[in-house]
Every structure is written in structure tokens, then in C-alpha cells.
């Protein structure tokens, strides 16, 4: 059983908290400290952003984080090194990479999949890879035991949902809002209806992200989805608390986890 499946099974019907940070923001040492701190405060799965120069799906908060990481020279290989170092002391917590196809394409799908598996990556989500064209990367990930994680948006067609249901591993990431990460208004009733609809086709957990910024919104989403994904709020706390990132983010993660139990 994969680490992601084990993580959901261990919750025994409880809901997973999946926090997101950008690797290398503000630096590699802090990234590792944040990863361990988030796990210590209740994170069930970690989502690591791979910095990219044109993060079209991300709002201004995560865009700035990517810019800071790129200014530090962070590459995809550095991201894999971070996971490798994390695995030296944590072999249980699943790690998912979230990013864009270009850096993966540059490395080569086979080499990336092999190196990701060796480093201890459990899942990969490339936000700009339509399900219709992802087959070459999907095959390499599958051959190396790494889950291919897909986004589903409010506008995703039924045919595409069916295709994703056949291919997806780990969990499916439902984008609760149209637009970019960090967007504001969240209609939990609409999300609930959509999750119920998606589970007609999808039999693995569904995580909801975009627009979840506090314990109250996390609690509401936790009532209807198997996982709650929080990114922009955490990245904003990192941006606003230089030198004290791990403590502030740890406290926020604990608050969020307490809300979704």
C-alpha cells in the first residue's frame, strides 16, 4: 500500500490536512524545518511547490514565493534533494510535488520519475498537463510507483472526469473556485454538491483546495471532502514572519488540523 493510501487509511474516516509550501522560500533549511514542523503539528500529507517562472495557476502570494525561491537558485533537482533529506528522518509522511510541466520536461520524464521515486516522492501534480496529453509522464510515474494526481475544476466535463477517474492515484485535487490560488469567496454548499457528484465516478479520496484560509473554512470543507488543502494562507504567513516561519506556520497547521478532525 502506498504512503498516501496508508495516510488516509490511518485516519479511519477522519479528514486529512494537506498544507502547501514552496520549496526554497525563504531558503532550503527553513523549508525542511517547516516540513517537519507541519508534520509535528498534524499535517497528514505535505504538498511541495516546485518553483517556476510562469506559475499561471497561482495567485500573487504563491507567485512571490516562487520568485523568492528562484532568486535563491532553486531547481527541480533541489526540490528532490529536499525530499531526500526529509526522508532521512521521516519515512511515513507522504510528499506530493505540485508544479508545472516545463521543469519536468527539461529533466526528462523517465529520469524525473526515477529520481522522484528514489528521493521518496509519493505523488506528482503538474497543473498545466491536460489529462489528454499526460500519458508519457503518467506511464513513467506509474512504472516507478509514484501516484499521478489530477486537478478537477468546477468546469471539468463529465468525459474528462471519467478519464481522470481511471488514471488518478493517491487523491484527486478539486479546485473549489474558478481562478487562481488565494481567491476569496468559497461556497461550501456548492462544493458539497460537487464532491457528491464526483464520487459517482471517483473512488479515491478527494481533496479540496483554493479559497481555504482559516479554521472555519477548513472545518466546513472537512465536512464534505476527504482532505483539506491549504496553500496561500500558509505561504503568506511565511512571507510575513521572516525568522519565525516554523513557529507561526506550525501554530496555524495545528489550528487547521484541529478544525478538520
Swiss-Prot record:
Upper taxonomic lineage: Bacteria, Pseudomonadati, Pseudomonadota, Betaproteobacteria, Neisseriales
Record-linked Pfam families: Trp_syntA
Keywords: Amino-acid biosynthesis, Aromatic amino acid biosynthesis, Lyase, Tryptophan biosynthesis
Pathway as given in its UniProt record: Amino-acid biosynthesis; L-tryptophan biosynthesis; L-tryptophan from chorismate: step 5/5
Protein's UniProt name: Tryptophan synthase alpha chain
Family: Belongs to the TrpA family.
Species annotation: Neisseria meningitidis serogroup A / serotype 4A (strain DSM 15465 / Z2491)
EC supergroup of this enzyme: lyase
Tree of life domain: Bacteria
Function (record text): The alpha subunit is responsible for the aldol cleavage of indoleglycerol phosphate to indole and glyceraldehyde 3-phosphate.
HAMAP family associated with the record: Trp_synth_alpha
Active site (catalytic residues): 47, 58
E.C. number(s) listed in UniProt: 4.2.1.20
Gene Ontology cellular component list: cytosol
Molecular functions (GO terms): tryptophan synthase activity
Cross-referenced CDD domains: Tryptophan_synthase_alpha
Gene3D superfamilies: Aldolase class I (3.20.20.70)
Enzymatic reactions: (1S,2R)-1-C-(indol-3-yl)glycerol 3-phosphate + L-serine = D-glyceraldehyde 3-phosphate + L-tryptophan + H2O
Subunit structure: Tetramer of two alpha and two beta chains.
Amino acid at each position: 500500500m502506498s504512503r498516501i493510501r496508508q495516510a488516509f487509511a490511518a485516519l479511519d474516516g477522519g479528514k486529512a490536512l494537506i498544507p502547501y509550501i514552496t520549496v526554497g522560500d525563504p531558503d532550503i533549511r527553513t523549508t525542511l524545518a517547516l516540513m517537519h514542523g507541519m508534520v509535528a503539528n498534524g499535517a497528514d500529507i505535505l504538498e511541495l511547490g516546485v518553483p517556476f517562472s510562469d506559475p499561471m495557476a497561482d495567485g500573487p502570494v504563491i507567485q512571490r514565493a516562487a520568485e523568492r525561491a528562484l532568486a535563491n537558485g532553486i531547481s527541480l533537482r533541489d526540490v528532490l534533494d529536499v525530499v531526500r533529506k526529509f526522508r532521512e528522518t521521516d519515512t511515513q509522511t507522504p510528499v506530493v510535488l505540485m508544479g508545472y510541466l516545463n521543469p519536468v520536461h527539461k529533466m526528462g520524464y523517465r529520469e524525473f520519475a526515477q529520481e522522484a521515486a528514489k528521493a521518496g516522492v509519493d505523488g506528482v501534480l503538474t497543473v498545466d498537463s491536460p489529462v489528454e496529453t499526460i500519458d508519457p509522464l503518467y506511464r513513467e510515474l506509474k512504472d516507478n510507483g509514484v501516484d499521478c494526481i489530477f486537478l478537477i475544476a468546477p468546469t471539468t466535463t463529465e468525459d474528462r472526469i471519467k478519464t481522470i477517474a481511471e488514471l488518478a492515484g493517491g487523491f484527486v485535487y478539486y479546485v473549489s473556485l474558478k481562478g487562481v490560488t488565494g481567491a476569496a469567496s468559497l461556497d461550501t454548499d456548492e462544493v458539497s454538491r460537487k464532491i457528491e457528484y464526483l464520487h459517482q465516478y471517483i473512488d479515491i479520496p478527494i481533496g479540496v483546495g483554493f479559497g481555504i484560509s482559516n479554521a472555519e473554512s477548513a472545518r466546513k470543507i472537512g465536512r464534505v471532502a476527504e482532505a483539506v488543502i491549504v496553500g496561500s494562507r500558509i505561504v503568506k504567513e511565511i512571507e510575513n514572519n521572516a525568522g519565525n516561519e516554523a513557529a507561526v506556520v506550525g501554530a496555524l497547521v495545528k489550528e487547521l488540523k484541529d478544525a478538520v478532525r
